């Protein structure tokens, strides 16, 4: 039994470090892909992005990765809870725990302006943008 542990001992540290790094990446970070030009010029189509899952309070202008109708999306927060927005020509107050989001390329973005329920709920936010990665690196 001792010889078995002597043989695997040199491999234990790299294996443990790799497992801890993978766990940390899964819990703290999120890797994403920008599929369209809806966030240009800020994020180019084809860019990879790194998001922070543990993001604290979200504010206007933050770029978030979230789920909407079963799809991951990347948009900028345009209004927070309590803010008044105009949706379909009517003033509305953003509900508690929700955000109103827009793409930076508003002429080519499917965002809160077009949804029946225009709000992103906090529980649907997966991450806050931490770092865009140059699309030429893909």
Model-assigned labels for residue ranges:
Residues 1-138:
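Extended hydrophobic leader/signal-anchor segments used for secretion and membrane insertion
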């Amino acid at each position: 039994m001792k010889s078995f542990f002597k043989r695997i001992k040199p491999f234990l540290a790299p294996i443990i470090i790799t497992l801890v790094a993978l766990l940390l990446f899964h819990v703290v970070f999120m890797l994403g892909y920008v599929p369209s030009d809806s966030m240009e010029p800020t994020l180019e189509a084809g860019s990879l992005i790194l998001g922070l899952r543990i993001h604290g309070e979200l504010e206007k202008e933050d770029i978030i990765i979230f789920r909407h109708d079963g799809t991951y999306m990347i948009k900028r927060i345009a209004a927070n809870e309590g803010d008044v927005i105009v949706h379909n020509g009517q003033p509305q107050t953003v509900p508690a725990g929700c955000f109103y989001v827009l793409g930076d390329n508003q002429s080519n973005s499917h965002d809160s302006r077009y949804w029946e329920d225009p709000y992103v709920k906090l529980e649907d936010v997966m991450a806050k943008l931490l770092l865009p990665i140059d699309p030429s690196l893909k």
